[in-house]
Amino acid sequence: MAEEAKSKGNAAFSSGDYATAITHFTEAINLSPTNHILYSNRSASYASLHRYEEALSDAKKTIELKPDWSKGYSRLGAAFIGLSKFDEAVDSYKKGLEIDPSNEMLKSGLADASRSRVSSKSNPFVDAFQGKEMWEKLTADPGTRVYLEQDDFVKTMKEIQRNPNNLNLYMKDKRVMKALGVLLNVKFGGSSGEDTEMKEADERKEPEPEMEPMELTEEERQKKERKEKALKEKGEGNVAYKKKDFGRAVEHYTKAMELDDEDISYLTNRAAVYLEMGKYEECIEDCDKAVERGRELRSDFKMIARALTRKGSALVKMARCSKDFEPAIETFQKALTEHRNPDTLKKLNDAEKVKKELEQQEYFDPTIAEEEREKGNGFFKEQKYPEAVKHYSEAIKRNPNDVRAYSNRAACYTKLGALPEGLKDAEKCIELDPSFTKGYSRKGAIQFFMKEYDKAMETYQEGLKHDPKNQEFLDGVRRCVEQINKASRGDLTPEELKERQAKAMQDPEVQNILSDPVMRQVLVDFQENPKAAQEHMKNPMVMNKIQKLVSAGIVQVR
């Protein structure tokens, strides 16, 4: 149950529904309160909703449950950064690195927290972006509340909150300036009186360019312009990709990368183009670069997972020739550790399935299978049943379509008392070849040993349809009838009757019959109302169910 709730939480988180994710993770925690991963996942969900206090609490609980798990300190550091407690964030990342010194995510987090700590001491606006108060103020103000529904605005404010010096890059964004005014409790621009006095002059003059409230350095201005040009190139690349003009798409994505190397989506997009073009080596190279650069930039886990998934897809394409799916499987598994995406999980399952099928094809050898089966027969005759099972199992691996190997192994399991395993092999015989009579005799014998006499009789009767004169089947039916009649006549000892009834009550069919209100009334009528019982006996469905209860020892005929 906890695992199911966790899976639902992961799916909701993947779709961006963080509130629902929190609900599911909370349900999972209630079912499994000592699972540190659940607290870690809920911490990430709280952080995504800017609820950093709750994120911090869950991060601390994660570490309490699993103090040697480095990811817990990554969650703790992220929560402290969200609360603008940069000293504590630095300490958290350092503690995580003591456990896992090579963890790139912790290294990036430490560098980020250290930069933010330095900038927070020199930036006059840093107090405006402190912790959850920033999001509460923006939510409370009607003018900025609508902006929080815009993903690019939320992303921008997160960047500024992480490093207040980034404010200079977004001074032309009216939404950012509006938000800054709300946070500082001031209004940027002239008063309404000044606006009225200047109205006439404004109507006569050409509108002047909007002045930047704060001057950008030349380097910052150039960086912003490059980012804008890069996004434009990306947009044109997307258009070309949709038109399947892959050559032009590659050109645009390459230009975008040259203009801005801090956005790995240009690399993953170009990798997607290479994948479509069949240039798998180039695709893999771009994906590797995206992962490496993404870790340096501390990019979103989803972006890194996307790059790994794309690499895995390229490796699958290549494996169709090389027949080596292991690299693709490993890559998909890495992607899932970054971000559990249903599409990636499906790709992993498909790759594992194909790998297994290939292994079975390569291992298939009827000649060796027959040799192994004969070896098993030799050990069976010597009553060395465990050794016989070993050789029959190898024969099945070499040729999974040979019913004789399953039949022989079923006989071994029966001798060893492993009746459920023997029953499974006998049913496999019938599945592979319904006309293979030995499968019915094996299955019927095992069911008889399990004291499931009604089921054994059905199996023998099914076998008689394929071989009406088979003496083994006829004898099997006779033995089953004798056992069933013993129960119906009351010839069983109290212990035998109790055992048979207890076994019958485990049968879902018997449970359904006894829980059916109509059948319960029928049983009462058979005891108390002979006239009604006579009417019931005319109904074939009712009598079949009565016979089932008689066979199971639940009902006795006096």
UniProtKB/Swiss-Prot annotation:
PANTHER family, alphabetized: HSP70-HSP90 ORGANIZING PROTEIN 3 (PTHR22904:SF533), TPR REPEAT CONTAINING PROTEIN (PTHR22904)
Gene Ontology MF terms: Hsp90 protein binding; preprotein binding
Motif (Bipartite nuclear localization signal): 227-244
TPR repeats: 2-35, 37-69, 70-103, 136-173, 230-263, 265-297, 305-342, 369-402, 404-436, 437-470
Composition bias type Basic and acidic residues, residue spans: 196-208, 219-232
The record's note on its domains: The tetratricopeptide repeat (TPR) domain, forming a carboxylate clamp (CC), mediates interaction with the highly conserved 'EEVD' motif at the C-terminal ends of HSP90 and HSP70.
Pfam families assigned to the protein according to its UniProt record, in alphabetical order: STI1-HOP_DP, TPR_1, TPR_11, TPR_16
Subunit comment: Co-chaperone that forms a complex with HSP70 and HSP90 and preproteins (e.g. chloroplast preproteins).
Location(s) in or outside the cell: Cytoplasm; Nucleus
Name the record gives this protein: Hsp70-Hsp90 organizing protein 3
Protein's UniProt keywords contain Magnesium: no
Name of encoding gene: HOP3
Biased amino acid composition, Acidic residues: 209-218
Region entry Disordered, spans: 191-232
Post-translational modification note: Phosphorylated.
Annotated ranges, domain STI1: 131-170, 507-546
Biological-process GO terms, alphabetical: chaperone-mediated protein complex assembly; heat acclimation
Assigned keywords, A-Z: Acetylation, Chaperone, Cytoplasm, Nucleus, Phosphoprotein, Repeat, Stress response, TPR repeat
GO CC terms of this entry: cytosol; nucleus
Known role: Mediates the association of the molecular chaperones HSP70 and HSP90. Mediates nuclear encoded chloroplast preproteins binding to HSP90 prior to chloroplastic sorting. Involved in acclimation to heat.
Principal subcellular localisation of the protein: cytoplasm
Disruption phenotype: Decreased thermotolerance after a long recovery (2 days) under nonstress conditions following an acclimation heat treatment.
